[in-house]
C-alpha cells in the first residue's frame, strides 16, 4: 500500500504547483497575471490529490500573488491566464493600480526596515568611540594650569636635580627663562629628560635645567 505524504510547507507547495501547472505558475523570470477565480479551478483540479489541502493551497496562492515578481507583471496590456496558460482577458485598470500600490507599500516597508537596522547598528559604534575620546579631551585642561605662575614664589627653595634622582612620572620644575615651570617627567634617555609641562607643552632638557 502506498501512502501519500501531505505537503505542509508553503515553499514545497509552490514547487509542486510549478511542476504540476508550469504554464500557469512560473518558477523563474517574469510571471503572468492569474485568472480571477483561479483558486476554485485549482481546488477542483486537485480535489483528488491528497498531497495538498485547500487551506494550504490558498496560503501558497496568496504567497505567489503577493510577491514583488508577480506584482510587477500586473501592468497595462498584460493578459490573465488560466491553469493551462490560456489567455483569459486583459487586466482592468483598477487591478493594475491596486497591484502598483501594493508593490510600493511592500518595497517601502522593506526599505524602512533596512534603514532602521542600519541606524540601530550605528549608535553602538559611536558609543564605543566616545570613551576613547573623553580622556584625550580632558588632558589639555588640567586643574593645575593656573599654578605655574605662582611657582616662582618658592623658587628659592628649589635646587638643581641630579640625573640619578630623576624617574618617569616624577613631578619636577623646569628652568625656563627667569621662572621655573612645573611639569611631569615622561621619559629619560641618557642625559636628556622629556618633560610635559602643566601647560600641555612637551619639551626635552638636560638634567641641570631641572629643579627639585
Curated annotation (Swiss-Prot):
Biased composition (Basic residues): 127-141
InterPro entries (UniProt xref): ProQ, ProQ/FinO, ProQ/FinO_sf, ProQ_C
Pfam families listed in its UniProt record: ProQ (PF04352), ProQ_C (PF17516)
SMART domains the record matches: ProQ (SM00945)
Top-level taxon: Bacteria
Keyword entries, A-Z: Chaperone, Cytoplasm, RNA-binding
Cellular component annotations (GO), alphabetically ordered: cytosol
Regions crossing the membrane: none
Compartment list: Cytoplasm
A molecular function GO annotation: RNA strand annealing activity
Region (Disordered): 107-153
Function summary: RNA chaperone with significant RNA binding, RNA strand exchange and RNA duplexing activities.
PANTHER family according to UniProt: RNA CHAPERONE PROQ (PTHR38106:SF1)
Protein name, per record: RNA chaperone ProQ
Organism (species): Shewanella pealeana (strain ATCC 700345 / ANG-SQ1)
Lineage, top ranks: Bacteria, Pseudomonadati, Pseudomonadota, Gammaproteobacteria, Alteromonadales
Amino acid at each position: 500500500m502506498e501512502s501519500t505524504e501531505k505537503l505542509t510547507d508553503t515553499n514545497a507547495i509552490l514547487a509542486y504547483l510549478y511542476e504540476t501547472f508550469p504554464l500557469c505558475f512560473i518558477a523563474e523570470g517574469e510571471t503572468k497575471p492569474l485568472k480571477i477565480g483561479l483558486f476554485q479551478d485549482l481546488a477542483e483540479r486537485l480535489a483528488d490529490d491528497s498531497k495538498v489541502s485547500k487551506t494550504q493551497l490558498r496560503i501558497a496562492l496568496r504567497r505567489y500573488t503577493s510577491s514583488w515578481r508577480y506584482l510587477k507583471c500586473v501592468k497595462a496590456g498584460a493578459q490573465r491566464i488560466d491553469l493551462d496558460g490560456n489567455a483569459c482577458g486583459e487586466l482592468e485598470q483598477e487591478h493594475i493600480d491596486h497591484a502598483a500600490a501594493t508593490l510600493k507599500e511592500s518595497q517601502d516597508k522593506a526599505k524602512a526596515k533596512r534603514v532602521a537596522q542600519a541606524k540601530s547598528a550605528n549608535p553602538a559604534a559611536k558609543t564605543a568611540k566616545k570613551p576613547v575620546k573623553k580622556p584625550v579631551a580632558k588632558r589639555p585642561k588640567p586643574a593645575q594650569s593656573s599654578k605655574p605662575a605662582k611657582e616662582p614664589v618658592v623658587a628659592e627653595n628649589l635646587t638643581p636635580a641630579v640625573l640619578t634622582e630623576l624617574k618617569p612620572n616624577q613631578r619636577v620644575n623646569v628652568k625656563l627663562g627667569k621662572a621655573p615651570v612645573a611639569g611631569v617627567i615622561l621619559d629619560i634617555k641618557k642625559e636628556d629628560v622629556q618633560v610635559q609641562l602643566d601647560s600641555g607643552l612637551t619639551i626635552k632638557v638636560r638634567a641641570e635645567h631641572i629643579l627639585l
